[in-house]
UniProtKB/Swiss-Prot annotation:
CC terms in the record's Gene Ontology section: cytosol
CDD domains in the record: trmE, TrmE_N
Keyword check for Nucleotide-binding: yes
Cofactor(s) the protein requires to work: K(+)
Protein name: tRNA modification GTPase MnmE
Subunit structure as annotated in this protein's UniProt entry: Homodimer. Heterotetramer of two MnmE and two MnmG subunits.
Function: Exhibits a very high intrinsic GTPase hydrolysis rate. Involved in the addition of a carboxymethylaminomethyl (cmnm) group at the wobble position (U34) of certain tRNAs, forming tRNA-cmnm(5)s(2)U34.
Annotated (6S)-5-formyl-5,6,7,8-tetrahydrofolate binding sites: K29, E87, R126, K456
Short name of any one Pfam family annotated for the protein: TrmE_N
Keywords in alphabetical order: Cytoplasm, GTP-binding, Hydrolase, Magnesium, Metal-binding, Nucleotide-binding, Potassium, tRNA processing
Amino acid sequence: MISTNNSSTPETIIALSTPSGAGALAVVKLSGSRALEIALKLSRRDHLQPRHATLANLWNREDEMMDEAILIYFKAPHSYTAEEVVEIQCHGGTLIARKIIQEALALGARVARAGEFTYRAFLNGRIDLSQAEAIGKLIEAKSDESYKVLLKQLKGELGRYVEGVRGSLVEILAYAEVSIDYAEEDLPSDLEARMVEKIERIAEDLERIYQGSKRRSSLVEGYKLAIIGRPNVGKSSLLNALLLWERAIVSDIPGTTRDTIEESLHLGNHWVRIVDTAGIREAQDAIEKIGIERTLLALKESDMVLALFDSSQSLSPEDEQIKELLRAHQENRRILVLFNKSDLSRELQDSELESYPHRYISAKEGGVEELLSLLASWLDEQGGGEELMLTSERQLLCVKSALGELKEARDRLIEGELELFAYHIQGALKELSLITRPYETSELLDVMFGQFCLGK
């Protein structure tokens, strides 16, 4: 559990901020009221100039030199945590950094918990909660598109938007209070209509961002692409062709792939998780049955589907099952029908399959370059460009709840129930505030910041 000291001098924390292991450099970070004091004792210097790199030898309690390092002092509040911070850049490897941390602990620091540096930045008002979430996700970002979205959030664009909406709602709430307190006074006749229009405009904008964010929800974590088809249709060959290496076993024996195989690759500016699934047919044994069940789950969870059919053969009963699955799952996902084995004579003709976006390919002989280009262009359309985005389930839930409150507020205003109208406007304000500055105390924040890496 992340905790903070309630005194005016919170504990000084220390952690390795770079990945543990062999490397040219390692960065050890101190934060807290005694960070400078501890760094001066380690380096045996009488001062460090803020924001200047200082080359110094580091010493232990036995007067043994531990390393030659660079120290950078960030004076509060101009640091990541808004506290006194010292970064120690020492030589890489685990041993040197561990010795430095051990000495700092002996001088009064304690080991930082996961995410505690960012937690302190949040508590000290340097960042809001949406920015803290962006930091955690930015560390894990795997694509240019997710990087751009998260960087905008880190810069505070979501926070500024939320504060703008809150400001508008506060003005509306003021109208409610005036109308309640001065019910007998003559107020402008069109005031209620203007307030209704303003609420509807705010709700419409929030709904647009909410729906757009749901549609693009896979952008940050990576889009999921499922390859489906009957056994022995060429799914594993296609996976290998997309990856440019032999990931899956390719065999003429039907049912070779009995479980889902997941790999990832970059498509243009996007990170995509490709799932090669077990062939759809009547299961021959319990293990194959489990594999087929996982295939159906992968289909339900996918953002895009590549449905593979053998163009050199007429449709089989298993192919008809695939067609039924496509009909059932064509909402909220892109489907591309691939007629494989185009290097052989074409026997398959089916108007329903050809009504989907489709391509003729040969997974063994080539032709996947055009396919990759098409998928990348689809993902570009899905990305949404520079549009503001909610990047966590928590943010989505807050906006969804705020929309519910705004709908109730609008209805109550039209009915003339001003006190209930004010109550629901306050509810919307609270829900939106949770995006950047939650009322909840330790439990929610412990879960959030506990997902960060040590040293962040």
